[in-house]
């Protein structure tokens, strides 16, 4: 930070966390990396969060209090709406970008078993096309490295192949981007670019078998009907793909229903791909064509740094080298606290808090979820409900005791069956800000 320069926001100030502690709270940091809050500094932090802090001595150095840091995307320009205004969608969704429209779900609206359609996050790369008046006449083209190219109307797709229905998580690659330091470019998602829905459709594998994959088939090239923001019909908004092996996974679906109802326009009506466990951009909306290629697809959204991460760690804030990247496929382990909401106030004298949430990790499954009320000094295991399938999220519940009134931070972290655990700090910095899966933290005030 340049000498004499004033920071304009709490995010900018905490670009140098220990300096921020000193400026705001007068906190000194020891070798344990947990700060010492005393006298005026302790009073200042208490005033900032609105209550005394029972576990103040445990606060890690440079920690932005959760009441400020979590679930609050950076504000857009004054002309941008901060809450969503879109038919069929919950107005409490938070807009993180308006061109194209992108909106995330507050954690408390994510649901338990499934995320309601109206609360499901929105991720677009271009415009949202109108839903067709006669959806069953929508045609999906299958071509490329196949023996029998197909043009299948949706109505025929529904009757020609076995219908499947599965609860599966979709998550944007940028979920958690707001927690990278220094900031990475892109929509500043916090925890809500994710949702779990029950998807109904047919296996893509069954359709590709009907088309007859050639031995040269390597990768899919998927396309949708979303218009480019420029209005130029010759420009493609997005065209991503997957290896043929993932396309043939029995859980990869061509879906036309979401939570028992036909897809609505923001979620890809009338037909979309659902590629569970992989980054959300692979689950193309408004799907109208799948071309099978004899090499890795190089369409829009497959080159440069788009949906790619460094092969080796790079210095945070550096430009990176496009040649030293790999395609980002799966998402890391993550948990979220769905209740209570961040910033909840409980009645004076409350001495226990009931928690609920969910955790997921691609197809690896969840081994355990742990929660803490004392800034991570001690942890307690949550109770896990069994998932309903390999790509469902694991719902969890827990109860934590609280010693007194005051300000608490409830932290949650998950560990998957491969042994990976959510980190406290996003250590996998990359230019596009993919895969930040830090602990979920919420603030709770008692009294």
Which residue ranges define each predicted feature?
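N-terminal secretory signal peptides
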Residues: 1-35, 58-61
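Intrinsic disorder/low-complexity segments enriched in polar/small residues
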Residues: 4-8, 19, 39, 71-78, ...
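A generic N-terminal leader/anchor concept
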Residues: 12-15, 22, 40, 92-95, ...
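Short, intrinsically disordered, low-complexity terminal segments
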Residues: 17-19, 45, 58, 66, ...
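N-terminal export/assembly segments and adjacent metallocofactor-ligating motifs
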Residues: 25, 55-63, 68-72, 151
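N-terminal export signals
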Residues: 35-63
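Structured, non-membrane catalytic/scaffold regions adjacent to prosthetic-group chemistry
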Residues: 71-447
């Amino acid at each position: 930070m340049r000498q004499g320069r004033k920071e304009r926001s709490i995010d900018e100030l905490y670009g140098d966390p220990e300096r921020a502690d000193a400026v705001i709270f007068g906190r000194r940091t020891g070798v344990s990396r947990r700060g010492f809050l005393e006298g005026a500094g302790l009073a200042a932090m208490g005033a900032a969060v609105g209550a005394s802090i029972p576990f103040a001595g445990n606060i890690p150095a440079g920690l932005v209090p959760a009441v400020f840091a979590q679930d609050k995307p950076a504000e857009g320009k004054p002309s941008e709406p901060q809450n969503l205004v879109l038919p069929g969608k919950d107005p409490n969704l938070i807009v993180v970008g308006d061109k194209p429209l992108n909106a995330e779900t507050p954690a408390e609206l994510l649901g338990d078993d499934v995320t309601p359609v109206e609360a499901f996050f929105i991720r677009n790369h271009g415009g949202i096309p109108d839903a067709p008046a006669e959806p069953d006449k929508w045609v999906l083209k299958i071509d490329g490295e196949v023996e029998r190219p197909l043009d299948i109307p949706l109505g025929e797709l529904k009757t020609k192949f076995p219908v499947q229905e599965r609860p599966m998580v979709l998550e944007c690659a940028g979920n958690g981007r707001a927690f990278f330091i220094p900031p990475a470019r892109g929509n500043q998602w916090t925890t809500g670019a994710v949702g779990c829905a029950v998807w109904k459709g047919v296996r893509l594998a069954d359709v590709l078998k009907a088309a007859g994959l050639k031995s040269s088939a390597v990768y899919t090239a998927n396309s949708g009907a979303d218009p480019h923001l420029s209005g130029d019909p010759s420009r493609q908004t997005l065209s991503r793909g997957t290896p043929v092996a993932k396309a043939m996974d029995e859980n990869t679906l061509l879906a036309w229903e979401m939570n028992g109802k036909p897809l609505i326009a923001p979620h890809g009506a009338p037909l979309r791909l659902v590629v569970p466990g992989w980054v959300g951009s692979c689950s193309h909306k408004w799907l109208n064509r799948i071309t099978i290629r004899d090499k890795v697809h190089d369409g829009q959204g497959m080159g440069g740094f788009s949906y790619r991460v460094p092969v080796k760690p790079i210095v945070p804030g550096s430009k990176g080298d496009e040649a030293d990247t790999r395609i980002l496929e799966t998402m890391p382990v993550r948990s979220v606290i769905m209740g209570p909401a961040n910033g909840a106030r409980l009645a004076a004298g409350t001495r226990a808090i009931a928690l609920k949430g969910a955790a997921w990790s691609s197809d690896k499954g969840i081994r355990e979820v742990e929660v803490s009320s004392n800034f991570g000094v001690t942890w307690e295991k949550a109770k896990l409900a069994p998932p309903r399938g390999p790509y469902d999220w694991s719902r969890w519940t827990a109860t934590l005791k609280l010693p007194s009134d005051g300000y608490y931070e409830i932290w949650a972290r998950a560990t998957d069956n491969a042994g990976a655990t959510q980190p406290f700090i996003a250590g996998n910095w990359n230019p596009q800000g993919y895969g930040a899966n830090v602990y979920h933290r919420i603030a709770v005030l008692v009294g």
